[in-house]
């Protein structure tokens, strides 16, 4: 079965992320670790929220807040902020292929959005569970989270395109010593 160039590039991005533990543990693992910590705090009873919080979350502000939580968790993976830097050793090969650079960037953005979508679902799902949001409010929050995550990932990809970390000795350095990830956290 013949695949499109975009699908092949997206599969390449996914394989590269899964093949290198440093990429996976220093990036997408963060979006799993944060909700896990908050979940443990909630279950242990150490996460105490004022009673007014539940009331606030039932209104329209709850949709925006849950969406912002989902967007934050979805954007913490750093996949887009290190997309070009992780390919630094292969840039000459990539430039020599008869494909427009637009396709490479679209695949990198789609890869980042796969993780952002997962993180947004985790963040909005956790907020919906914690504050008993209605399905309609949760769906609205998810749309907000995905929109904000797309915006953040576009900014991160542009930042890494303009200022990539091209010289690194180990794959870990491409992710851990990259200031683009820290900049995108803020």
Where do the protein language model's features map onto the residues?
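Hydrophobic alpha-helical transmembrane segments of membrane proteins
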Residues: 1-92, 100-186
């Amino acid at each position: 079965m013949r695949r499109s160039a975009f699908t092949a590039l997206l599969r390449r991005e996914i394989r590269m992320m899964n093949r290198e533990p440093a990429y996976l543990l220093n990036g997408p693992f963060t979006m799993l670790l944060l909700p896990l910590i908050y979940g443990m705090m909630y279950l242990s009873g150490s996460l105490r929220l004022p009673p007014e919080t539940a009331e606030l979350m039932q209104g329209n502000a709850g949709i925006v807040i849950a969406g912002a939580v989902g967007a934050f968790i979805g954007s913490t993976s750093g996949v887009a902020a290190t997309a070009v830097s992780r390919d630094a050793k292969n840039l000459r090969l990539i430039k020599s292929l008869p494909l427009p650079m637009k396709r490479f960037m679209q695949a990198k953005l789609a890869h980042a959005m796969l993780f952002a979508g997962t993180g947004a679902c985790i963040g909005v799902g956790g907020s919906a569970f914690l504050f008993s949001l209605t399905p309609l409010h949760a769906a609205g929050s998810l749309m907000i989270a995905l929109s904000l995550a797309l915006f953040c990932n576009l900014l991160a990809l542009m930042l890494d395109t303009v200022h990539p970390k091209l010289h690194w000795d180990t794959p870990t350095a491409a992710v851990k010593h990259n200031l683009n990830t820290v900049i995108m956290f803020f």
